[in-house]
Amino acid sequence: MHTFTSRMDVLPAEQRQVLRLLGPTRSMGFVLYGGTAIALRLGHRQSVDFDFFSSRPLDKEAIRKSLPFIARATTLQDRPDTLTVLTKSNVKVSFFGSINFGHVEEPEQTNDRLVCVASLPDLLATKLKVLQQRVEAKDYEDVAAMLRAGVGLGVGLAAAAKMFAPAFQPAEALKALTHFQGGDLQRLSTKEKQSLIQAASAVRQLPAVTLRSDLGLEAGAFVQSQMPPAYTQSQPSTAVTKKPRQGPRMSI
């Protein structure tokens, strides 16, 4: 599995402390998604919680055994395939199981081998879906940061369309990226708004992407790959292309 240099420096001290305890999540099949995953990759903003996804059913006892600080934390939500806790240092950590929306690029480990983080195309796809569920400036900031990093908006839209069909409609996401109304969107800078409008206006046709049927941490996931991930175009693949079952609705 490839590694990347994480931007741990943007995290609050309490969150950095928790991150150093999360090493066992890799062998348990968890991949980090959400704002903190994007922040670790790009360092563009602070994000104060952790959202871990797994294709496997959630084994809460195994989580508590492998991560003792989770057992000592305050439980905020405990239901099938979902566990959310608040640590003693007030950091929220969530685990979601049976997430079967798939992935289009392989996750990577942080260079300190602490956690596995979803690829930028997959993070963009999930953020584009979130735009249809809520109106929060941080989600638009995340999308703008990933576009600045070179992720193609068309790739993110195509991935989201495959991952979340039929609920996700690319046209609705494009509309959201050009109309900034509601919530706290007044926080967005003029530059961010202009970049989002420009990117949305440039989309003409969605590229072909190959959807793999898990989150990338199944058996053999830690074998070193010889091919680096491509963030702006899809690569030929022999992976399964059928649409996987969707996991539970969530905001990330």
Can you describe what each PLM-predicted range is?
Residues M1-I252:
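Compositionally biased terminal segments of proteins
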